[in-house]
């Protein structure tokens, strides 16, 4: 049996749960319970704060978990966890920022003794030390952007996705500390346990199959027999397109193929030019 730790709230919670459900690992949640069953009796779920999950997995409380790369770095657990997968969403950057009217325009302008407010004191401190800087770290639990304007700090170190929030709060980016995405991580001892490793890899395989399918589309069409060679040359598919007879029309063939989502528009245009018709483009839930 393995225990999977998932964020109990926040921006990555919903998409992660949706991916798990699409992978076939349906989670049965009862009320506000911190634990849940899945369709597999050997895989149980624990809901926790995303910031606590790196330590829970490292310490073996959970065998596998989903969290942000920034949170792994904050808890200094990166080297102690088995990195299994980058979901490539939940993108954010941890940046140092200063008020727009500040004389600090780059990391070179930051001086020892300045105050910096952050929700990431550990990561911020280690980064500044690498830069040879000794600042006073002010730990906050939210609303970091206001700190320079109420005399709490000179700078902030906070997450941003687009930079819009910084601009709205009259802040300018001074230094990029780290870029972060959502990660699937495992306990190293759990990965060495044959039975647990099998279950963890089943979870990993299911997630990969959903993420891979998100970038693909199944395209189906009826096409003239004399154009099949030209058509199959522009839709090679994953292992070659599937071509089959149409019983009611001996001049046409049915062709199915999987193509990249970003090539759908161009491909459909070319298929129509070659005489393909009844073209269907369908999302795919999983590719194994």
Swiss-Prot record:
Might you report a single GO cellular component term?
cytoplasm
Q: What regulation of activity is recorded for this protein?
A: Feedback inhibited by histidine.
List the pathway annotation.
Amino-acid biosynthesis; L-histidine biosynthesis; L-histidine from 5-phospho-alpha-D-ribose 1-diphosphate: step 1/9
- EC number annotated for this UniProt entry: 2.4.2.17
Q: Explain the purpose of this protein.
A: Catalyzes the condensation of ATP and 5-phosphoribose 1-diphosphate to form N'-(5'-phosphoribosyl)-ATP (PR-ATP). Has a crucial role in the pathway because the rate of histidine biosynthesis seems to be controlled primarily by regulation of HisG enzymatic activity.
Q: What class of enzyme is it?
A: transferase
GO biological process terms held by the UniProt record: L-histidine biosynthetic process
Where does this polypeptide localize? Cytoplasm
Entry's Gene Ontology molecular function annotations: ATP binding; ATP phosphoribosyltransferase activity; magnesium ion binding
Q: Which family does it belong to?
A: Belongs to the ATP phosphoribosyltransferase family. Long subfamily.
Which is a Pfam family this sequence falls into? HisG_C
Q: Which domain of life is it from?
A: Archaea
Q: Its gene? A: hisG
Catalysed conversion reaction: 1-(5-phospho-beta-D-ribosyl)-ATP + diphosphate = 5-phospho-alpha-D-ribose 1-diphosphate + ATP
Source lineage: Archaea, Methanobacteriati, Methanobacteriota, Methanomada group, Methanococci
Protein name, entry field: ATP phosphoribosyltransferase
Cofactor(s) recorded in Swiss-Prot or TrEMBL: Mg(2+)
Question: Has keyword ATP-binding?
Answer: yes
Q: Which SUPFAM superfamilies match?
A: GlnB-like, Periplasmic binding protein-like II
- Which keywords fit this entry according to its UniProt record? Amino-acid biosynthesis, ATP-binding, Cytoplasm, Glycosyltransferase, Histidine biosynthesis, Magnesium, Metal-binding, Nucleotide-binding, Transferase
